[in-house]
């Protein structure tokens, strides 16, 4: 029987996908305050994000990413396209994926959930709000990872 073992915060890894370096730096600062031992990897495009996930899934040299944070509005491949691609890939579809955007449009939010996003965060937000969001996300996904794997549920 295979189970997912509990992940310690020092082993928890987040992939951040954002074409805006300033926003990525804000997320990094907020994450340092929210969960200082969590590792953050940043790529600047959705295509790079897909490639990163496929490579890490194939080679496991860094270990699997535990959570993906993806901006919705990016050039070339949008956040919508990224979510569809990841959730449509049998090897990647279980990857927890949180979309964030300046759009609070109900249609955008609904579309993200219909494509398979696990959560949606609207910005702008204060640094304090960002820290609280990241604390909650990391705590939630650490709890999920500590649940018994599918083999135990049969």
Where are these regions (language model features)?
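Short, glycine/charged-rich "phosphate-handling" switch motifs in NTP-dependent
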Residues: 118
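Conserved phosphotransfer cores of two-component systems
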Residues: 35, 57-63, 87-94, 115
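A Lys-centered signature of the CheY-like receiver
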Residues: 123
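Non-catalytic signal-transmission and effector/linker regions of two-component phosphorelay proteins
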Residues: 1-15, 21-39, 47, 54, ...
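Receiver (REC) domain active-site loop signature in two-component systems and cognate sites
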Residues: 74
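Active-site residues of response regulator receiver
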Residues: 71, 101
